[in-house]
UniProtKB/Swiss-Prot annotation:
HAMAP family: Ribosomal_uS3_B
A Pfam cross-reference name: KH_2
InterPro entries for the chain: KH_dom, KH_dom-like_a/b, KH_dom_type_2, KH_sf_prok-type, Ribosomal_S3_C_sf, Ribosomal_uS3_bac-typ, Ribosomal_uS3_C, Ribosomal_uS3_CS
Biased composition (Basic and acidic residues): 212-221, 231-252
Quaternary assembly: Part of the 30S ribosomal subunit. Forms a tight complex with proteins S10 and S14.
Protein name: Small ribosomal subunit protein uS3
CDD domains: KH-II_30S_S3 (cd02412)
Disulfide links within the chain: none
Gene Ontology MF: a single term: rRNA binding
Lineage: Bacteria, Pseudomonadati, Pseudomonadota, Alphaproteobacteria, Hyphomicrobiales
Family: Belongs to the universal ribosomal protein uS3 family.
């Protein structure tokens, strides 16, 4: 099932947390949930050129704190903070709570799955060869510290008459391992031949803080050191022992 399910949803509560962090009574839950959906749709639409990866919404008492994770924070803030004031006014019109907006810069957008998927989708819309776009994204991610990446592109690639799926993978992407930090993102390219879907999985390493067995194993390896491990001898250096007094002649 790890191959089919959304890797982010599978790991919620294990090594990932929710993008909406608030509690509401039964009567208000639906209203606040729809507010979150509308706020996210508006922000992703308004900040299409700002490389927004995700929007986290928190609701303390009678307040609404919106945190925008962006690869280009300068585009979000605008000149002297003018654009962020406009965003705050628009969000205030959608909710009755007092609105606060925070901007967090994404240091390595090349290993953010959503931003990688959107970048490939934009290149497909500009008629860049899909293989070149996928290979370039894979190389950039591996160069900047990703332990593995997989990219799927599906649709009428290159204007072909029959839709197909093309994929590239480099490194390791363990989808069944729950302690693995796997980021997942999707995007859609609207081309003249139709839509093309892009899916990206990025493996950033294993999170071992909450796994006591993994911590004990790692600590034991560090204490033992590399020299205490038994070394395997080469095939030519093996000593052949005495094979005994076995009779090699013909049996009577």
């Amino acid at each position: 099932m790890g191959q089919k399910v959304n890797p982010v949803g599978l790991r919620l509560g294990i090594n990932r947390t929710w993008d909406s962090r608030w509690f509401a009574n039964k009567g208000e839950y639906g209203k606040l949930l729809h507010e979150d959906i509308k706020i996210r749709e508006m922000l992703f639409k308004q900040l299409k050129q700002a490389a927004v990866s995700k929007v986290v919404i928190e609701r303390p008492h009678k307040k609404c704190r919106v945190t925008i994770y962006s690869g280009r924070p300068g585009v979000v803030i605008g000149k002297k903070g003018a654009d962020i004031d406009k965003l705050r006014k628009k969000v205030s019109e959608m909710t009755s709570s007092e609105v606060f907006i925070n901007i967090v810069e994404i240091r390595k957008p090349e290993i953010d799955a959503r931003l990688v998927a959107e970048s490939i989708a934009q290149q497909l819309e500009r008629r860049v060869a899909f293989r070149r776009a996928m290979k370039r994204a894979v190389q950039s991610a591996m160069r900047l510290g990703a332990e593995g990446i997989r990219i799927n592109c599906s649709g009428r690639l290159g204007g072909a008459e029959i839709a197909r799926l093309e994929w590239y993978r480099e490194g390791r992407v363990p989808l069944h391992t729950l302690r693995a930090d796997v980021d997942y993102g999707t995007a859609t390219a609207f081309t003249t031949y139709g839509t093309c879907g892009v899916k990206v999985w990025v493996f950033k390493g294993e999170i071992l803080e909450h796994d006591p067995m993994a911590q004990d194993k790692r600590q034991a390896e560090q204490e033992a050191g590399p020299s205490s491990r038994p070394q395997r001898r080469e095939r030519g250096d093996r000593e052949r022992g005495d094979r005994g007094d076995r009779d090699r002649g013909h049996r009577a």
